[in-house]
Amino acid sequence: MIEVENLYFDYTDFKGEKIELLKDISFKIESKERVVLLGVNGSGKSTLLKILNALVFPKRGSYIYKGMRIRKRGFKKISRSFRKDISFLMQDPNMLLFNATVREEIEFGLREFGFDDIEKRVEETAKRFGLEKYLETPPFYLSGGEKQRVALASLVAIEPEVLLMDEPSANLDPPTTEWLMDLLRELDITTVISTHNLALAQKFGDRALVLSDNHTLLFDGLLKEFLKNEELMGEAKLLHRYG
Ligand SMILES: Nc1ncnc2c1ncn2[C@@H]1O[C@H](COP(=O)(O)OP(=O)(O)OP(=O)(O)O)[C@@H](O)[C@H]1O
Ligand SMILES: [Mg+2]
């Protein structure tokens, strides 16, 4: 479903120097796989997710989604079906909330993609996400965890095939994190989730992609194998000295 091959991404910093952020990254993700993306701060996780969501494009190498090469040139032609298929819960939910009320927030995507019975879908989604009492509230007033839930509700309402999530548990308390995991299990769609929470990672998915701090792909395989391998964990700088 998702094929990334020899992908490179760089940017030019304020001194005019080229900084490589993703180097020679290759992996494949099959439909309905649940993949956990690990790596230290700045290793490139969010950037990789942005590439998978076609918010930025690779500098070299390829990203192929359902057999289509995703690149800047010609993206407009497929952007509508691509955006219906792939949803991205960004690291900061504020980036995703721009409507006057929670109701309008959930309605937005449903309208955009021409769903029928929008009212009914909004009610159902609100119920599923425990947002009924906030439907007329401006998202602006909500707590971080509640905003996260609204952002996720708006994305899931349009029934995407792929859900990309950047640190989804960062704002969530333990019961809401548990609820998120149940939801992901129930959704049963392709998911790629970046997280720093190794204790929870295994509940999010079985497979891990691990970026090293030199921006290459250090590991692609079973998450439980990675967590057992102290040498690799050390190389990824994901071991705690105070444990
Ligand atoms: N266009 C750009 N201009 C300047 N700096 C950039 C640009 N794009 C990315 N960066 C830098 O690249 C680095 C990698 O960013 P990214 O957000 O992908 O890392 P991350 O693995 O998600 O980190 P975190 O765990 O902190 O969320 C960061 O240091 C960021 O500041
Ligand atoms: Mg990030």
Question: Which role does the model predict for each range below?
Answer:
Residues 117-134:
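Conserved ABC ATPase "signature" region
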Residues 138-142, 146:
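Conserved ABC ATPase signature
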Residues 163-166:
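Catalytic Walker B motif of ABC-type/P-loop ATPase nucleotide-binding domains
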Residues 61-72, 82:
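Conserved ABC transporter NBD signature motif
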Residues 195-196:
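H-loop/switch region of ABC-family ATPase nucleotide-binding domains
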Residues 215-239:
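Conserved beta-strand-loop-alpha-helix hinge in the C-terminal portion
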